[in-house]
Amino acid sequence: MGSQCLILLLSLTLAQAAEKDRPKFTPGPISSFPAQQTNGKVTVAARVFVKEADLRAAFGKLNPNDHGILPVLVMVANLSGQTLALGDLRVEVITPDRRRLEATPAADLRYLSGPPRPNMTPGPIPGRTPRLSRRKDPLAAWEIEGRAFSARMLPAQESASGFFYFQARYRGGSRLYLTGLREAATGQELFYFELPLEDQ
């Protein structure tokens, strides 16, 4: 029993150390977002991430745009007296030519490029088995899922933020369309939110 406790304690310590090594990312106050809309006492704000400095602050060396993924940071501020249910949240980008693009779940991004092909490099000694190269998909980086929007409930007077990911390039004149916010107690859906996505 004592060895199991020691192993558990060691794994928790290592997890905390790994978390400390990860760079911090703060979305900033909702007032700093370039696009905002308030319905009742709920405000939704959005910021598209295409600038190198913004991407580096959020994703480190990984630039999702290089892999055809557009990250959009969304913040929801609930200043109402009701808890909001976010489980049915639906987020889309509407392009200037009116195409609707649904957000891709963060957990699915690592599979977009398909399984990596083994690199059958011949071994250094003839007759030996070739070495397999184990190339990791760049979109499997912890920042993708770790910084995704994950809130399912939002208590009164609180806010939640995170990224939604779209398989698209940024196009000026695009808009973010968000539906599915409900009052948890009544199930009543809030009015939709539609925000411009301008690169600012």
Residues of each region from the PLM?
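Bacterial N-terminal signal peptides that target proteins for export
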Residues: 1-6
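Hydrophobic h-region of N-terminal signal peptides that target proteins for export
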Residues: 8-17
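Conserved functional micro-motifs across diverse proteins
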Residues: 16-200
